[in-house]
Each structure stands twice: as structure tokens, then as C-alpha cells.
């Protein structure tokens, strides 16, 4: 193996991935662990996460027959920059172009195990007088930078990027600049309803296909009646034995995610009026779900809905890191 490697940690709330990139910035090895900032928060210390990163570092060296000197630089993104991460780093403020972002990485010396400098990639936030428009992210920013390169290949330079997750973030990007962010509760809300409410039997369903009409009904009821009433209707469906289990499930998804359509419609109509393209960065399930909601709520405002597949085999975070390295010219 050729020397001149880069190690990149992508650490979230519940999982951490370590990527080994060669001198040509090609991924040659990946290690995954089910530990993230949540484990640090629960324990009251970041030691569990630091130990995880140190262990992954040693494993990466051993499994690839490398010495520490073979790793020329280490980067980390995501929740490692949060209070329960590796080291808290303040968010950068949008609008921010890729060059300024790449020049704003935070150099941190990890002394307890790895014993090296790690370049931490900050999150992003908005800064407006009206706090109702607040948005912030940690980890999604580097995915956005990676996705922007993919969109360039499609001739797209101006789009609203939707990144579903525990918190679904929508970022408006234009000409290599992250211009705005709007952040929302979604996946975490779904989990709470599934684990802590009487809707658990409805949401435990695993349908073979999503019923698009029921998604639309859920989203429409959320718009007409508000979340509280719309989600109760799903409970009533089960009590009164109305509709099939998979239809109730699709309805629930429409309610939980229907607000995203309303939020996106508001921003496209009132704030991002030049934007005519929506990009869904997700797995196939979320693409099918959100494409129905976007078409239903934003149809007259959107010209194209684009899908960028994101799964275990596709990492836009790695693509974002490559872009940062190429911008700064610091491979070594």
C-alpha cells in the first residue's frame, strides 16, 4: 500500500464511520461502530466516544498494515464538534461559500489516545433577527458540499436540498454557496410516537409499498387541521378498524412529514423565490415518501424533483471532504 493516507471520521448521534482514503482520495477501507454523541450524553462524558475513535484509529492501522506515520492528516465531522463530541466547535454562519468554509476548519490536538491533530469540520447555522427562522446542523453540511458536486454534473447550481433524518434539514444552495438552512423535527418525532404513544401498533407496520393516496391524505389533514388533530385521526382509524394497516402507516408518515411540505412551500414562495429545484438526498423509502409530499404541496413552485441516493454504499460526506481538500490543496 502507498503512503500518504487520510483518515476521516464521520460521527453522528448514534453511529461513527471511519474512512481511509489513499493519496488519490479514493476510499480503500471503511470501519463502522454503533457509538455516537448520544452515548457520551448518556454517560455524562465524551470518554466513550474518544475511546471509540481511538480504537477505530488503531484498527484502521492494523487492518491495513500501516504505521501512524502513513496517515498524513485526520479529519472529523458531525457531532464530534458538539458539546458531547470530541471538542465543541462553534457553528459557522450562512451564507457561506465552499472556499470560506474549507478555510475555517478547526485544528484540535487529541492527546488521550490518538495523540495527533485532528481537523474538525464545523457545523452551520443561520443568524437572523427573527428567531423563528433559526436553523443549524452538524454533519449535514459536509454532505451538502459533496452533493453540490454531484448536482453540478447535472447542470444544477440552484436548489433546495432536503436531508431526512432524526432532524430533517433543508438547505438552499446557490453557486457554491450554502445560502440558508431550515431545520425540523421528523425522524425523532416518528420514533417518539412509535415508542411512547398508542400509535405504536400502527407505526410498527412494515409495508411492501407506500400508499400514495394515504400519504396525501395525511399531509392534507396536517395542513387543514394541524398536527394534533391529524395524528389523532390515525388513532381513530385503528380503533374503528378503518383502512388496512399499511394504509394507516402511510397516513401517519404523511402527517409526520407533511409539515415539511408546508415549510418548503413557505420558503420557496416567500424567501427562496428563485429556487425551482428540490433535491432529495435519501434512501429509496424516503424519496418515495417525500416526493409525494413535495409534489402535493409545492407542485406549482417546483420545476424538478431530483433524487440523490444516500445509503451505506454512497457517502456524500466523503465527497464533501474531497471537495474541501481540493479547495485548500492540503492532501498531505
Say what each PLM segment does.
Residues 15, 274-293:
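Glycine-rich phosphate-binding loops at beta-strand->alpha-helix junctions
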Residues 36-44, 125-160, 164-224:
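Glycine-rich phosphate-binding loop plus the immediately following alpha-helix
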Residues 54-73, 261-274:
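Phosphate/pyrophosphate-binding loops at sites that engage ATP/ADP/AMP, CoA/4′-phosphopantetheine
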Residues 63-108, 114, 119-134:
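Short beta-strand-loop/turn "lid" adjacent to the catalytic site in phosphate-handling enzymes
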Residues 220-263:
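Adenine-nucleotide phosphate-binding core of ATP-dependent small-molecule kinases
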Residues 255, 259, 306-332:
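Glycine-rich phosphate-binding/hydrolytic loop that grips phosphoryl groups
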